[in-house]
Amino acid sequence: MNKKILKLGILTVAGAAIVAMKKSKKEKLVYSYPQTKVKKSDYKNTELNKQKKNSKGIYYSSGNYEAFARPKKPKDIEKKSAYLVGSGLASLAAACFLIRDAQMSGDHIHILEASNIAGGACDGVADPDRGYIMRGGREMEDHFECLWDLFHSIPSLEHPENSVLDEFYWLNKEDPNYSLCRATNHRGKPSENFGKFNIDAKGRKQIMKLFFTANEKLYDKTIEDVFDEHVFDSDFWLYWQTMFAFENWHSALELKLYLQRFIHHIGGLPDFSALKFTRYNQYESLILPMVEYLKQNGVIFHFHTQVTNVIFSFENDQKIAKSIEYIKNNETKILPLTKDDLVFVTNGSCTESTLYGDHHTPANGDAQIRTAGCWNLWKNIAKQDPSFGHPEKFCENVSKTRWESATITTSNTKIIDAIKRICKRDPLSGKVVTGGIISCEDSNWLLSWTINRQGQFREQKEDEICIWVYSLFCATPGNYIHKPMKDCTGEEITAEWLYHIGIPLDEIDELARDHANTVPTMLPYITAFFMPRTAGDRPDVIPDGCVNFAFLGQFAETPRDTIFTTEYSVRTAMEAVYGLLGVDRGVPEVWGSVYDVRNLLDASVRLMDGESLLGADLPMPVEKLKGWILKLIKDTDIEKLLKEYKLIKK
């Protein structure tokens, strides 16, 4: 009944609109829309000022004209220096843009990093004591406009005559990504619903309503405030939740932005055919080429340097970074700054205070969790002005921002055979294996696992595979190991995973104990950026009035884009550099699929698992109204478009 009502409502609105149009031609209806008071003599069609910069000193662009252009060197760039706090993807990207587009000399660029290695959350470590460690993975797609703008300029490590983008492009052309098994149940049996969303009319209505809700109406609202069991019990939500790591208590605003940002990939959600992956882990594939590029250009890295504060002065509506406070070799030091010294700070972190275990030790240690490092830095900066954001909204509820992951390394043939049975590919082929995560839909932990192209590490043995496992419900007892994941050793996590991939019960314990090595990692703030928020909680990339200071990364505010992506980090870096230095080149706008009627039509059919409101058989008199509409659009481009995207049958 609800489905019929929804169809009737949509068709009635469409029919009423057509009736109104016809009637207006005959009766010249007068509408009381507010009129803009502009004299005809004052109006002129023009595209002048189309590329006028906004208050942050940037403008957005699209198309090849801007993408292929090289900007002129900004005025007085030789007098300027840059200090980048943190060495994650956002900071390294900013340094690359300083060199490539702002044409700043590399020896004027300083990267201040608290640890002994660059890369931030984009890691991949072969720890000599613990083993291989990957805290997370990175999913990429065609329309990461800023990311690809950057990496087409970064030389490949293996073949410097090619760019990182060149090799990524060739790899994903020759070995395209897609999954042959998205979810399992009953200990490794493929889900019967593969490829379908199975969401009812009420659930689709809730998604549609969220999609069109103004951002302001979603401030501080959770997903539970806008969805109920009609969405949560669907396969759509299983796919969405496990792919993007959304929890029910996370931000409804961020979910809405995700729906709009990736509307062009709704069809690729069940089988991951929309995604692209690097050849190796992200540290080796993305971070190392950037570090090498920066070093070749003379950029100076300062490791073991923990920045604790940036001190500002406030003069005539200007906010000027005057000094950097930092700790090096257990000494507190102060670096004085001038207006020509630019400061870029990565505020907040999803991997801060990571807790590591090993095959025999859990990664729990909740008592050790702290908001040190970049969280305290952001708090110290935020105390000085409201425009610097509210870090406490994101970092003070660890039970709602954490989950746990683990890296399992094995060469055991029984385990590899079980993997082959599920993913229908050879994990040792060097090509796509799972094609993305496989979610165990009846797992108490909501455990998901994935195997990317092997080896994930250049030094990995030929017969070894690295499996990445993560669980959203890490405080719930498991199905085989009756303990929460957060209290489990690597061996116990392996046993739980082996249970869900169908290893015989009498073989699980031995295989977990003697034929794998697993490193668990607890990430207390991994989904901190998903917490409900309102305007001002995240600072603008360049806060109003800032002369020589910008924020970078996942907790800086930029319009329309979505966090937890490599694109977001690079976009904020590009905006920060272009804005502070006056680089006269457009920042590529977020891909506009949300404004493309073709993507909207396609998504509407796919969300209904191939059904269409206009293509379905409807009860009278709705069927008669539908027929009238179809007759009205016959032999028009509208009819062609609706047929192409299967809203009406050919």
Enumerate the language-model features and the residues they cover.
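Rossmann-like flavin
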Residues: L157-H264, K276-F277
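Helical element adjacent to the flavin cofactor pocket in flavoenzyme catalytic cores
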Residues: Q260-L342, N347-G348, H360-T361, D366-W375
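Conserved FAD-binding subdomain of flavin-dependent enzymes
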Residues: D129-W170
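Extreme N-terminal leader/targeting segments of oxidoreductases
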Residues: K4-A82, R100-H108, L607-K650
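Glycine-rich Rossmann-fold phosphate-binding loop(s) that bind the pyrophosphate
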Residues: G86-G88
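C-terminal segments that line or cap access tunnels to active or ligand-binding sites in enzymes
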Residues: I263-T278, D340-L342, N347-T572, Y578-Y595
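Glycine-rich FAD pyrophosphate-binding loop
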Residues: I99-A126
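N-terminal Rossmann-fold NAD(P) dinucleotide-binding loop
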Residues: S91
